[in-house]
Amino acid sequence: MSFNREHDLKLKFKSSKKLKISATFESMDLKEGLLRGIYSYGFEAPSAIQSRAITQIISGKDVIAQAQSGTGKTATFTIGMLQAIDLKKHDLQALVLSPTRELAAQIGKVVTNLGDYMNVKAYAMTGGKTMKDDLKKIQKHGCQVISGTPGRVLDMIKRRLIETRHVQILVLDEADELLSDTLGFKHQIYDIFTKLPRTSQVVVVSATMSPEILEITKKFMNDPVKILVKRDEITLEGIKQYYVNVEKEEWKFDTLCDIYDSLTITQCVIFCNSKKKVDWLAHKLKQSNFAVISMHGDMKQDERDRVMNEFRTGQSRVLISTDVWARGIDVQQVSLVINYDLPEITENYVHRIGRSGRFGRKGVAINFLTKIDASRMKEIEKYYKIKVKPMPADLSELS
């Protein structure tokens, strides 16, 4: 797994305690099977967040970890979690909650891959399948780690289909989304927490962490170690950011077609703010003979899985989506993100454009601005302390 190590090492963190920084995975005193899994997965040395947070998680402390997209946050809590669980016990010991099914499934794969030489039993519980299917697989194979969405996990717990007595660690990934009021996850998280042993460790992870979210964590965390990237470090170095003035909403489509015709794209994600707009744009592009796929939260799970697989394997190069795809989904070859609509939530800007330039690769983000978007763009620039440039007339300069 290739990081932009030069930039990664320059990141400035603020932490609640003086932290030991581990320069190598060997210095973390990890299980031999876990170490083999880490190197087999492609990691060579810990990223900045990994070098600070993994040993804190292993020590059993509650941890709040915040870092940019593409810096190895998922592996951070996964490595800590796999080191902590007792492989001799077949009970559920670790629970990871995420806001989307796709992210929960992806985390499940990371757990399986990193734990490949440990024979760890992990399962992704994401809805879209029957509870009977979930139960059958858990009973057949056993389960030490579950990665799931809050609704499905809570339902399984309430029906006593999964046992939480032995859960040692609860991880909230993309915690700002899980603990906000917008999607209704917060009360589900509280309910799940009350069903766990009082001694359970809590790890909270996200690319953005507002003061409001940090305040909420006090309700269920015990003197957590905070490892936070300083605000001016969140701007995703390595991603060129541009805007193009389109004046009117109806002119966006022609602008998109011009860009599509002019660039050689490895893979691209186009973000819209509504499911209706995603469907409309996908239909319009297909009518114009552009090959695209699309995904949003109203689609059936098997259809979403098919789309994700097509995009992840490179069968499709252009994906149109709502913010359901902005959170943590890792496809290495994405080189371009287009905000057809500027995000309505400021924090989602970094989640969206972080889909390009993964692990230090170069990426490009293009923002379409109508007249009414100009002030919104200024808000985003002010929040992240960045200056987004106008798109050059010669599009070859983008690469």
Swiss-Prot record:
Transmembrane keyword on record: no
Alphabetical list of Pfam families matching this protein: DEAD, Helicase_C
Chain positions of motif Q motif: 23-51
Source organism, top-level taxon: Eukaryota
All copies of domain Helicase C-terminal, residue ranges: 238-399
Disulfide bridge partners, by residue number: none
Domain Helicase ATP-binding intervals: 54-227
Gene Ontology MF term list: ATP binding; ATP hydrolysis activity; RNA binding; RNA helicase activity
UniProt-annotated location(s): Nucleus, Nucleolus
Xref: InterPro entries: DEAD/DEAH_box_helicase_dom, Helicase_ATP-bd, Helicase_C-like, P-loop_NTPase, RNA-helicase_DEAD-box_CS, RNA_helicase_DEAD_Q_motif
Assigned protein family: Belongs to the DEAD box helicase family. DDX48/FAL1 subfamily.
Function summary: ATP-dependent RNA helicase involved in 40S ribosomal subunit biogenesis. Required for the processing and cleavage of 35S pre-rRNA at sites A0, A1, and A2, leading to mature 18S rRNA.
Designated name of the protein: ATP-dependent RNA helicase FAL1
